[in-house]
């Protein structure tokens, strides 16, 4: 039982609340006209991530509109490789482009020593948000999980099949293990520093967890996440961690049991009845409305919201999407969702 006045933190501590707390992944984003204006003011996407005043502003924008129970730091999972001195850029219409890590020589060019100096503007954003958000709103810090971040670092961009990343994992296992060890260290350092600046909970995004076979999932998704959870629990006791092993399917059950996360975020493919029976007795569940229902709106949206609420609100639960809000989402549909979740009587 949590003594917190913040519903989001109470739910993560195991309380069942009616209505459940809610926030949405990518709640600060291109679907909001005020975000697009601030983004234009910033210049590049990374400039926005590293401008603490503007990053704070875009984090607060959806709170003003919708009254979410949590704010999530506005940043990107690729600030970690950027801070490790890998070249990272975001190209309009293309997404992230990185100078790929393919060899021991490439790996030797990465440097942990400047991590905190490089990420100082992000920590400043966290500090400003901690002071700016409403008293009942929780502040979530986050990072990409080592496997997911490694896919971008090795591929040099997004990928459909992760051929280069898996090629290193299977064909150069020692090199891959060295990269993952560096990412576990850097990610842990980064998250601890976010907590020290005011983050009250952490979410670890493993967007490409579902791409791995079970033995590699066990080592590189469960194993690395467990290390991060244990470190946070030891060094900053009381700060809950939410894991998001997107696409993990049946392996969600092992992930929850073996990482010991406080909460788990469910993608839209996870059956609700199964999540309620198999996952919710062990940790708080978060999710899992399909983001495209939020684009569609109308009765389909209402029915989708109700289906999730009916299935999961009998135990510790945080309402969310199964992945991030997409740019075509009408802001009025988000208002409709907020009103419906806030009005839920069980």
Swiss-Prot record:
Enzyme class, broadest EC rank: lyase
GO cellular component, one term: cytosol
Residues at the site labelled Transition state stabilizer: 76
Family annotation (PROSITE patterns): UROD_2
Binding-site residues for substrate, renumbered to this chain: 26-30, 76, 152, 207, 323
Signal peptide location: none
A Pfam family of this chain: URO-D
Alphabetized UniProt keyword annotations: Cytoplasm, Decarboxylase, Lyase, Porphyrin biosynthesis
Swiss-Prot/TrEMBL GO biological process terms: protoporphyrinogen IX biosynthetic process from glutamate
Molecular function via GO: uroporphyrinogen decarboxylase activity
Record flagged with keyword Lyase: yes
SUPFAM superfamilies: UROD/MetE-like (SSF51726)
UniProt-listed PANTHER family: METHYLTETRAHYDROFOLATE:HOMOCYSTEINE METHYLTRANSFERASE RELATED, UROPORPHYRINOGEN DECARBOXYLASE
HAMAP family named among the record's database cross-references: URO_D
Family: Belongs to the uroporphyrinogen decarboxylase family.
Biological role: Catalyzes the decarboxylation of four acetate groups of uroporphyrinogen-III to yield coproporphyrinogen-III.
Protein's name according to its UniProt entry: Uroporphyrinogen decarboxylase
Organism: Paramagnetospirillum magneticum (strain ATCC 700264 / AMB-1)
Organism ancestry: Bacteria, Pseudomonadati, Pseudomonadota, Alphaproteobacteria, Rhodospirillales
């Amino acid at each position: 039982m949590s003594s917190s006045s913040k519903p989001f933190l109470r739910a993560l501590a195991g309380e069942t609340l009616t209505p459940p707390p809610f926030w949405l992944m990518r709640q600060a984003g291109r679907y909001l006209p005020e975000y697009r204006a601030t983004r234009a003011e910033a210049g590049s996407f990374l400039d926005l991530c590293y401008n603490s005043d503007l990053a704070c502003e875009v984090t607060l924008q959806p709170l003003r509109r919708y009254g979410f129970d949590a704010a999530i730091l506005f940043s990107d999972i690729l600030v970690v490789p950027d801070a490790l001195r890998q070249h990272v850029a975001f190209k309009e219409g293309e997404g992230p482009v990185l100078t790929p890590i393919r060899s021991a020589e490439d790996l030797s060019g990465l440097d942990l020593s400047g991590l905190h100096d490089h990420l100082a503007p992000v920590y400043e954003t966290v500090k400003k948000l901690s002071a700016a958000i409403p008293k009942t709103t929780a502040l979530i810090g986050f990072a990409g999980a080592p496997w997911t971040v490694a896919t971008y670092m090795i591929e040099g961009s997004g990928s459909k099949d992760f051929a280069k990343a898996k090629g290193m994992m299977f064909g150069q296992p020692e090199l891959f293990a060295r990269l993952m060890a560096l990412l576990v260290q850097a990610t842990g350092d980064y998250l601890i520093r976010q907590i020290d600046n005011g983050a009250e909970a952490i979410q670890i995004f493993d967007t490409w967890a579902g791409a791995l076979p079970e033995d590699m999932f066990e080592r590189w998704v469960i194993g690395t996440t467990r290390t991060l959870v244990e470190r946070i629990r030891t060094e900053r006791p009381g700060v809950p961690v939410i894991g998001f092993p997107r696409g993990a399917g049946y392996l969600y059950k092992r992930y929850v049991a073996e990482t010991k996360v406080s909460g788990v975020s469910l993608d839209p493919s996870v059956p609700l009845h199964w999540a309620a029976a198999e996952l919710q007795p062990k940790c708080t569940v978060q999710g899992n409305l399909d983001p495209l229902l939020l684009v569609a709106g109308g009765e389909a949206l209402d029915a989708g919201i109700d289906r999730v609420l009916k299935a999961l609100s009998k135990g510790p639960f945080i309402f969310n999407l199964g992945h991030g809000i997409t740019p075509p989402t009408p802001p009025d549909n988000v208002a409709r969702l907020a009103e419906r979740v806030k009005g839920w009587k069980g």
